[in-house]
Amino acid sequence: MLHQKLNPTSSEDLTIDVDLLYETDPCELKLDEMIEAEPEPEMIEGLPASDALTPADRYLELFEHVQSTKLFPDSKTFPDCAPKMDPLDILIRYRKVRRHRDFDLRRFVENHFWLPETLSSEYVSNPENSLKEHIDQLWPILTREPQDHIPWSSLLALPQSYIVPGGRFSETYYWDSYFTMLGLAESGREDLLKCMADNFAWMIENYGHIPNGNRTYYLSRSQPPVFALMVELFEEDGVRGARRYLDHLKMEYAFWMDGAESLALNQAYRHVVRMPDGSLLNRYWDDRDTPRDESWLEDVETAKHSGRPPNEVYRDLRAGAASGWDYSSRWLRDAGRLASIRTTQFIPIDLNAFLYKLESAIANISALKGERDTEALFRQKASDRRAAVNHYLWDDENGCYRDYDWRREEMALFSAASIVPLYVGMANHEQADRLANVVRSRLLTPGGIMATEYETGEQWDKPNGWAPLQWMAIQGFKLYGDDMLGDEIAHNWLKTVNHFYQEHHKLIEKYHISGGTPREGGGGEYPLQDGFGWTNGVVRRLIGLYGEP
């Protein structure tokens, strides 16, 4: 595999002058206002109330004290702690005692907060179990119940049971859940599928979108919009009829397209960019421009090394988290430096393919319900998006989709995200055939397909392979008649996961698949996680299609 390096660029190229939200952000949450008037909680009968305050907003200088001193090795630990009493009383106590000579921050936190539990860590796998048996027995371990919610915690209560990925992740995640659902369906767990369907619909109804995850600190962003794919899965498996979700799909679409009507050429607002020819495409975005609660110290340190206004860096870090690819060379100006992140300046191929699927789903379900005007409107929207993607994101010279840098008006890097248009049926057969050749030569390994061909130390780059990318590549190529490539990726991935399982008796978040024996994937802001929701889901589905490896 060719080893590629990316060259840094001068800071003169990186100015932002047309993004409506960089100078003034009407959606920015004001901390002083939030302290004076907390949002009304969303009530679920029989459960403690949730509210929208993040731990950073709620605990203010106490939060910064804990995070800046690295009291816990993982920055996510304190945001996930639950208070033992009214948070305002905790903050008042902290302000009274913090300057005392004998003040002990660790003891104070331990006396006033419940530390998060990692229930799945107590599970011991049976080495005699097959891979299929292991996954089926993990579903109850990864299931959380509504009554698990603790008052004033950052966890957002949900009305039904849900699946968490495992490891440090004790909440459900939006796009992870779709790939987890594939395995639940294969395992015959329609009960959990129904619960998760109800939960995601409930979040759209109450928050206007599906958050990154069910934590207050995730409310300001979403993740790749895969609810339309979930609805399709519910329909196919007889769990829930697609018609009941039409309004939810429209609400999600409104979230992603907010502000589109008022944009002039070459302007952006939140998730939407008006291209030079007047077409509309989308980018990842977060309504906040502060350090992430769950990675506070890491974000502060990254911003220090950027040479840019910290709020711009924080926004791009948050938008990178919204992409699900946190982090990757896809979002970096200089592939060796996370501080060069520019997520909001890229038009991602995967996001726009998922939105094409959303537009198509709204059109199709509207047709089923006899809503002809809505059907025609959204068929046109889908057609317009496909045309814009082909114009800006299809690299005809090299035969692949690429992200587009709308600031510089040039194509960005090639990655495994390019297979999403095939998965949602947006490509034509010539594009699919040409893309297959590129994937074979640049991403395919004996262990599966890599996220990218660039070695940066980030987790969504070479040498790592991820379950959702394998699934979309397998099904995408098979949809266009390339069964040989789809089957090869499937067998390679099953071999990778099974080899690791036979040695360690667990499934993990990502795998090192570039050369040699498959092993744990590296990179990222946190240690490798096991469990693992979407790996379990994809592998379980593949076992149903191909049998045990």
Curated annotation (Swiss-Prot):
Cellular compartments annotated: Cytoplasm
Alphabetized PROSITE patterns for the sequence: TREHALASE_1, TREHALASE_2
Active site: D326 (proton donor/acceptor), E509 (proton donor/acceptor)
Gene Ontology BP term (one): cellular hyperosmotic response
Single GO MF descriptor: alpha,alpha-trehalase activity
Keyword entries, A-Z: Cytoplasm, Glycosidase, Hydrolase
Catalytic activity, as annotated: alpha,alpha-trehalose + H2O = alpha-D-glucose + beta-D-glucose
GO CC terms of this entry: cytoplasm
This protein's pathway: Glycan degradation; trehalose degradation; D-glucose from alpha,alpha-trehalose: step 1/1
Primary location: cytoplasm
Segments forming a coiled coil: none
Pfam families registered for this protein in UniProt: Trehalase
Subunit-level organization: Monomer.
Record's protein name: Cytoplasmic trehalase
